């Protein structure tokens, strides 16, 4: 009941700056705890850049939240982690530029290289973990459609022509808020409507149904790392 109350509260305040500020103040300990878990050390407001980034990420999650994203605190924790990792990546790139152009002493170069390698390894491990968590969440969401990962292996398009047809359907679905609402809220794909609009045979759409639904869910859900991994292109 507690988490549901938080979800409802965030939905209610997401467009109210004053209420957002109050909510952020209330959850500063939570934000700090999330940050410390990522960086592996104590952080303090006004001293650590990572905590400032976490604060901005938390506000971002409030403004973008809706119930389809699941539990708000879990959602915000994931976003905080991602923003901090993005920050580390940018810092790593900056340090490489300095090493190339700054003519640093050997000892300093070795230190910076060690930091860069450490950040890179940390980022890879974190991304792998986030992808695993996203796959678990996706598995649960697909189960509501009676879709398994095993199904996807069998129905994934193999030929260029088939990929093009599937891509056309997916692009059409994503461009139609009314169809997206039927998928998200009513849990069904309006095959007849797609058939009529695109003049694609009903059998083809039915055959592609599970694949289309899966790609649409990934594109519109909180699956940032799966999207990067799948690298699906809607032509």
From Swiss-Prot:
User: Which Gene3D superfamilies does the entry mention?
Assistant: 1.10.1740.10
Read off the InterPro entries from this record. Answer: RNA_pol_sigma-70_dom, RNA_pol_sigma-I, RNA_pol_sigma70_r2, RNA_pol_sigma_r2
The protein's name is RNA polymerase sigma factor SigI7
Q: What induces it?
A: Up-regulated in pretreated yellow poplar (PYP)-grown cells.
Q: How does it assemble?
A: Interacts with RsgI7.
Which GO biological process categories is it annotated with?
A: DNA-templated transcription initiation
* Family membership: Belongs to the sigma-70 factor family. SigI subfamily.
């Amino acid at each position: 009941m507690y988490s549901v109350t938080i979800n409802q509260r965030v939905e209610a305040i997401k467009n109210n700056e004053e209420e957002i500020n109050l909510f952020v103040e209330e959850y500063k300990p939570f934000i700090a705890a999330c940050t410390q878990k990522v960086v592996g050390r104590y952080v303090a407001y006004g001293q650590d850049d990572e905590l400032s980034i976490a604060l901005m990420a938390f506000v971002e999650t409030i403004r973008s939240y809706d119930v389809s994203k699941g539990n708000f605190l879990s959602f915000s924790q994931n976003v905080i982690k991602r923003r901090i990792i993005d920050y580390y990546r940018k810092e790593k790139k900056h340090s490489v530029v300095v090493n190339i152009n700054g003519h640093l002493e050997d000892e300093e170069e070795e230190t910076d290289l060690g930091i860069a390698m450490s950040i890179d390894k940390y980022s890879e491990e974190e991304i792998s973990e986030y992808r695993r968590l996203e796959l678990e969440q996706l598995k649960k969401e697909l189960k509501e459609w009676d879709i398994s990962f095993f199904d996807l292996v069998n129905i994934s398009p193999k030929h260029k022509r088939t990929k093009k047809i599937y891509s056309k359907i997916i692009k059409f679905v994503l461009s139609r808020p009314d169809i997206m609402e039927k998928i998200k809220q009513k849990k069904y794909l309006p095959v007849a409507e797609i058939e009529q609009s695109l003049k694609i045979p009903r059998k083809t759409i039915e055959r592609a149904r599970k694949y289309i639904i899966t790609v649409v869910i990934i594109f519109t859900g909180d699956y940032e790392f799966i999207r990067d991994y799948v690298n699906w292109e809607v032509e």
